[in-house]
């Protein structure tokens, strides 16, 4: 929506154009899902997944927002977004959560950050780099989580991702 005024805290700006790129230069069409999966399955199994959270995000918790990522929170969020989309197959969230619970956080560097999206409304979220060790997973589990992680570059993670929060860059490492 060109000409729309956007306010983040004290920053006030006007949208003059929108550019969008799909992960891995995939074409923006229905075949993205199958292309993403086939590209991932044809490569070597990853040992680490790094999520670089570029825009603050948090997760819904029972007693308020959760401002630190766990593998279970990240992948549950991604499954919800996958299943909400126009995907041909719905993924089992409980199964994904069980697989994600086997993954451990190897290293992290991040901090909380407050973002205001209205005069008196804001979100305290987190930003930073979070590397998860997935080397102990079975091949099928590894492939499932890496496809979901790469999908996260398209949809974001956590709360308010449709408003631009929770944008991530994902890096897969074999060493």
PLM-predicted stretches and their roles:
Residues 1-175:
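RNA-interacting cores
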